[in-house]
Every structure is written in structure tokens, then in C-alpha cells.
A protein has these predicted regions:
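N-terminal [4Fe-4S]-dependent radical SAM core
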Residues: 5-94
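Conserved SAM/AdoMet-binding glycine-rich loop
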Residues: 87-174
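Conserved C-terminal portion of the radical SAM core fold
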Residues: 177-178
Length: 178
């Protein structure tokens, strides 16, 4: 029964479905999103569209909790995993590329980093990629389709507004049509 299945995602404490609860139902265990920094840039920061960045984005590309880009992915993963396990002892992981625009780069670099991230630990169950609407291409779509066949894949698409005037005000670098 669809309604019954849907209601199973709610808890007695919360009348909405949290991501934590969704993951527990999907994977059967606590899931940690390990925020990795692939040392990507952003076309709204590197001069392609602008060098100012969006008004809400920090110097670290809003990846303030991601790993240090000067460290290897292995070291970033290990350090963040150890920190998470100080609070929660058991769980599996989603490799999370959060900082900057993680589909903005040569396709070979993207493929290498994403595939490497999936191999960092035997308990990685998925990949989460943060990006923006104007950084997709047919090659990116093909790569995402390949990754989706291999693992649980989510794309975080930064949609800050549906109003062109607001997008311009916040220096988003694209319009609603994008």
C-alpha cells in the first residue's frame, strides 16, 4: 500500500521525512555524508561569467565543511570519517562533493575523481554531487548516467531563485531559462 509505505518514513517525533530517516530506511543503517573537496572552481568565480562569485557563496565555494583541497581524497575521507565516528559508531557513507561547482571541469578529471571517491571505502553506498544549472553538457549527462548505474547517485542542483531579477541581484551568472 503506497500510503502505508509513505507513512513509514515519518517518525513519532517528526511529522516530516528527514534525509537521515530516508537513508536509514533505504540503506538500513546510519549514513554519513563525507564532504570531500575535489578542488573544483566555478564559472562565476574564475572569470568565465564573473570573478565575484554569488553573493551567498563563501571563499571556500560554500564547502566550509568539506575536506582540505590540498589533501588527497583518501586523507580527506579518513579525517572526516574519524571525526564522524566520534559521535556515531556505526554507519556507511556517501561521498559528497560539495565545494564549488562539481561538474565544472574536464570530463576526464570528473570521471577520475568520482570513481576514485567510490573506491575510498568498502562502505561507500553512494555519491552526492553539488553543482549549478549552467554546468552541464552531453558528456556530463553521460557520465552521471554511468555513475547512476554503478551507485546511488544524487545531484544537488543549486536553484536559488526562479526570478531573473533576483538571479541578477545575487550575481548568479545565469537566468531562469538556464
Amino acid at each position: 500500500n503506497l500510503i502505508g509505505d509513505f507513512m513509514n518514513y515519518f517518525t513519532n517525533e517528526k511529522h516530516y521525512n528527514t534525509l537521515n530517516n530516508y537513508y536509514r530506511h533505504k540503506f538500513g543503517i546510519k549514513i554519513f555524508k563525507i564532504a570531500l573537496n575535489g578542488n573544483f572552481s566555478c564559472p562565476n568565480r574564475d572569470g568565465v561569467f564573473s570573478s565575484q562569485g554569488c553573493i551567498f557563496c563563501s571563499e571556500s565555494g560554500s564547502g566550509d565543511f568539506a575536506g582540505d583541497p590540498s589533501m588527497s581524497l583518501e586523507k580527506q575521507f579518513k579525517d572526516i570519517k574519524e571525526m564522524m565516528h566520534k559521535k556515531w559508531h556505526k554507519g556507511k557513507y556517501i561521498a559528497y562533493f560539495q565545494a564549488n561547482t562539481n561538474t565544472y571541469g574536464p570530463i576526464k578529471k570528473l570521471r577520475t575523481l568520482f570513481e576514485k571517491a567510490l573506491e575510498l571505502d568498502e562502505n561507500i553506498v553512494g555519491l552526492n554531487i553539488g553543482t549549478i544549472a549552467d554546468c552541464f553538457s552531453p558528456q556530463i549527462y553521460d557520465l552521471l548516467e554511468e555513475l547512476n548505474q554503478k551507485t546511488y547517485l544524487t545531484i544537488e542542483l543549486g536553484l536559488q531563485s526562479m526570478h531573473d531579477q533576483t538571479l541578477k541581484l545575487i550575481n548568479r551568472g545565469h537566468d531562469l531559462q538556464t
